[in-house]
């Protein structure tokens, strides 16, 4: 039989669009780049952790930063999605013990050098918070598809867990 090459695109998630304005001189770090060691969180100063998802990623970095962190969440409780795993109350206990400031029901509107502007989700009242950087823990989206691929799986379709990506990759390979 054949033996021709078949390309399956499996990777490619990138940071999604930001729901806030950011000046060119503002320090905005993508959590994926921080975790990969591509960029580093400044060693000193307040860090705003923007967590529009309410999952473990924003909670984990805020917990690590401790009292330096200001966790901005649109939800009524930090890490709202952790309720499904049973870690909601323990995570909030850890955040409190670490000294993390939590800005609940808060939307991030703009990032400037040295400050962010936030808005109360319900009242619309805006105010500023001083910080040296923002770590964006927002949504990921797939990259543009490659030309002439037989299939797209994993992060090429939408962000996945490692388990989901490996499973989809194996299924795609088995179907070739």
Segments and roles (model prediction):
Residues 1, 96-108:
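A conserved beta-strand/loop element that lines the FAD pocket in flavoprotein oxidoreductases
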């Amino acid at each position: 039989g054949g033996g021709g090459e078949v390309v399956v695109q499996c990777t490619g998630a990138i940071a999604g669009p930001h729901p806030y304005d950011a000046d060119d001189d503002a320090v905005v770090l993508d959590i994926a780049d921080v975790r990969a060691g591509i960029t580093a969180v400044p060693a000193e100063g307040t860090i705003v952790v923007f967590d529009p998802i309410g999952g473990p990623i924003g909670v984990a970095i805020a917990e690590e930063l401790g009292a330096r962190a200001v966790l901005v969440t649109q939800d009524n409780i930090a890490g709202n999605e952790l309720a499904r795993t049973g870690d909601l109350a323990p995570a909030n206990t850890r955040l409190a013990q670490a000294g993390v400031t939590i800005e609940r029901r808060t939307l991030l509107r703009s990032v400037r050098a040295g400050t962010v502007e936030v808005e109360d989700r319900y009242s619309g009242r805006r105010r500023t918070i001083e910080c040296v950087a923002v770590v964006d823990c927002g949504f990921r989206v797939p990259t543009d598809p490659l030309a002439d691929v037989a299939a797209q799986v994993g992060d090429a379709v939408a962000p996945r867990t490692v388990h989901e990506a490996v499973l989809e990759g194996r299924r795609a390979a088995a179907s070739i």
